[in-house]
């Protein structure tokens, strides 16, 4: 749901998921729009890429507003949140592109409220992408977490998946 830089959405779309990317920052939204437009043009010569891009839609706006207006009949199966990672406690700086992204986007002080709303609006799962060293978002312990080297995915299981 929250677009970030679009990479996770692209991966999910490449796995066959329909993905709605929401981005509230107009600069980041424009960058994502440009990237999707370029991918669509490249997809004219690459049917696999065209299929992936066709499963992605980009919406400019607040995720909270979008979820708040979503009718119950159109509930999202899974809501994926990618709020800005909190400040690092280590002295090592983040990569330059992420430093620039932090400057453009700023922090996500409303991420906890978005999580609460997502828990009400998702059908099966809410997934929150976090730094492995970060506290749980809004202090809410997930059903389980999947942890990598630097990133953790906190999964809130709301009900059994079909099938």
Model-identified regions with their sequence ranges:
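Conserved beta-strand/loop positions that form the S-adenosyl-L-methionine
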Residues: 1-3
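Short, glycine/acidic-enriched loop or turn micro-motifs at the edges of active sites
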Residues: 5, 26, 65, 84-86, ...
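Conserved SAM-binding loop of SAM-dependent methyltransferases across substrates and taxa
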Residues: 5-17
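Glycine-rich, phosphate-binding/catalytic loops in enzymes
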Residues: 15-17, 95-99, 144
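Residues at the starts of beta-strands that form the adenosine-phosphate
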Residues: 17-18, 125
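S-adenosyl-L-methionine
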Residues: 18, 22-78
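Mobile active-site "lid"/loop adjacent to the S-adenosyl-L-methionine
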Residues: 83-114
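Conserved Class I SAM-dependent methyltransferase catalytic core
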Residues: 110-157
């Amino acid at each position: 749901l929250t677009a970030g830089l679009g990479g996770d959405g692209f991966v999910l779309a490449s796995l066959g998921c329909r993905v709605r990317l929401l981005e509230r920052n107009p600069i980041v939204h424009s960058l994502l729009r440009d990237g999707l437009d370029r991918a669509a043009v490249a997809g004219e010569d690459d049917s696999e890429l065209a299929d992936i891009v066709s499963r992605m839609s980009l919406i400019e706006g607040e995720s909270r507003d979008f979820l708040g207006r979503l009718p119950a009949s159109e509930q999202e199966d899974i809501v994926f949140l990618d709020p800005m990672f909190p400040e690092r406690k280590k002295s090592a700086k983040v990569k330059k592109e992420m430093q620039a992204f932090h400057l453009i986007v700023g922090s996500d002080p409303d991420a906890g409220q978005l999580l609460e709303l997502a828990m009400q609006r998702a059908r099966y799962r809410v997934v929150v992408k976090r730094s492995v060293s970060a506290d749980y978002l809004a202090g809410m312990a997930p059903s389980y977490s999947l942890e990598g080297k630097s990133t953790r995915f906190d999964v809130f299981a709301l009900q059994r998946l079909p099938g």
